[in-house]
Swiss-Prot record:
Core subunit of the mitochondrial membrane respiratory chain NADH dehydrogenase (Complex I) that is believed to belong to the minimal assembly required for catalysis. Complex I functions in the transfer of electrons from NADH to the respiratory chain. The immediate electron acceptor for the enzyme is believed to be ubiquinone. One of its GO terms (biological process) is ATP synthesis coupled electron transport. The keyword Nucleotide-binding does not apply. It catalyses: a ubiquinone + NADH + 5 H(+)(in) = a ubiquinol + NAD(+) + 4 H(+)(out). Belongs to the complex I subunit 4L family. This is NADH-ubiquinone oxidoreductase chain 4L. Its EC number is 7.1.1.2. It holds the Pfam family Oxidored_q2. Its main location: mitochondrion. It comes from Debaryomyces hansenii (strain ATCC 36239 / CBS 767 / BCRC 21394 / JCM 1990 / NBRC 0083 / IGC 2968).
């Protein structure tokens, strides 16, 4: 799990395409959420499941905001390549 997280973190740092960055951030949040659920099951903690649900909700909101900004940028400029 740690190897997957660090690999995705390096992918996030090395990308210059905005869509790839959004996907990498979403997968990073999903990795953290899976780890929290796993540890909550190991220690029989219900609050970790609620926290994971909160993280998934925030990830969905972040994804919606990012994609709406991307669509707005595309409508304004006509292209999306190399925004960063």
């Amino acid at each position: 799990m740690i190897a997957m997280f660090t690999t995705l973190l390096m992918f996030y740092v090395s990308q210059n395409n905005i869509i790839s960055l959004l996907i990498a951030i979403e997968i990073l949040l999903l990795t953290v959420t899976v780890k929290i659920i796993y540890l909550g099951g190991q220690f029989d903690d219900v609050q970790s499941t609620m926290f994971a649900l909160f993280i998934i909700t925030l990830a969905g909101a972040e994804s919606a905001i990012g994609l709406s900004l991307l669509v707005s940028y595309y409508r304004l400029r006509g292209k999306v390549t190399n925004i960063l």
